[in-house]
Amino acid sequence: MILLCYDGSETATHAITVAHELLGDVPATVLHLWDPPANYVPPDPAIGLQLWSPAQMAELASVILERANRVLEEGVALANKAGFAAQGRLERTIVTPWRAILDIADELDAQSIVVGARGLSAVEAVVLGGVSNAVVHHAKRPVLVVPKLS
C-alpha cells in the first residue's frame, strides 16, 4: 500500500497520475490533512473588540471540515480513476504536516509516500519550510516527490 498525499492542488493531482504511471495498480490510501481554525482567544481589553466568538469558531471549523471532506473525496476519485485501488483518510493536523504524514505512513506501514512539490525558491523554503522536503529528510521509507507542472 502506498500513501498518496493530496491537498487538492494541481501538483497533487499530477502526483497521483505520475505515481500510477511509475507504481502501477497497487492499493493506495489518499491522505488529506486539514487544519482547524486557531483556538478561540478571548478579546484583549486593550483592543476592545472581539473578532470571533466560540460559536463563530465552531461554525468556521465545520465549514473547513466540510471542505476537507470534499477535497478528500476528489482525491480518492482521482486515484481510483488513475487505476489505484484507493481509500481515503482525513486527518486533523495536530503536529506539523510533514510529521503527520510520516506518522500515518508508519501507522499504515506504507511501502512508499507520494507527495507533490510546490517548487519553492531557496528563500521560500527557508522561510516557509517545505512539506515535501521535510518528508524526504525524515522518512524511513521511499518517497516519490513529483514536481509541479511547468
Where are these regions (language model features)?
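Small/aliphatic-rich secondary-structure junction motif
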Residues: M1-A55, F84
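Conserved beta-strand positions in the Rossmann-like core of class I SAM-dependent methyltransferases
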Residues: T29, Q87, L144
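Residue-level recognition of beta-strand->loop/alpha-helix junctions
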Residues: H32, L90-R92, P147
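A short acidic, glycine-rich active-site loop
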Residues: L51-R70
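Structural beta-alpha unit
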Residues: E74-I113
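Glycine-rich, Arg-bearing micro-motifs that act as flexible, cationic patches
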Residues: W98, S112-H137, K148
